[in-house]
Amino acid sequence: MTVKKVTRLRRARKARLKMHELEVVRLCVHRSSQHIYAQVISADGSKVLASASTLDKELRDGATGNIDAATKVGKLVAERAKAAGVSQVAFDRSGFKYHGRVKALADAAREGGLEF
């Protein structure tokens, strides 16, 4: 692994430990060069309550690696989380910078009704 990835994973591990201690439901984000993924994970980390990604049938046809796609994923995961009965989450950015696609997803999830 590259040094950049190792430091990102270290940051993510520290943040997840704090969220686990608080026992809150978390919105976990992962991004690759082509896609973005979001999952709402239960407080104990054992169950995925809702998920959305650019690989979903509704989003697969358009562009998948840009800010517009991240916004659509954020709205979709917020809609699915509310359907599952989740309204408050902790935002787990998985060590990625809060910038660009990650920020767009978070803003869209907030607009969709999730409270961070």
UniProtKB/Swiss-Prot annotation:
GO terms for cellular component: cytosolic large ribosomal subunit. Pfam families: Ribosomal_L18p. Disulfide bonds: none annotated. InterPro entries: Ribosomal_uL18_bac-type, Ribosomal_uL18_bac/euk. One of its GO terms (biological process) is translation. The keyword Ligase does not apply. SUPFAM superfamilies: Translational machinery components. HAMAP family: Ribosomal_uL18_B (MF_01337_B). PANTHER family: 39S RIBOSOMAL PROTEIN L18, MITOCHONDRIAL, LARGE RIBOSOMAL SUBUNIT PROTEIN UL18M. Belongs to the universal ribosomal protein uL18 family. This is Large ribosomal subunit protein uL18. It comes from Pseudomonas syringae pv. tomato (strain ATCC BAA-871 / DC3000).
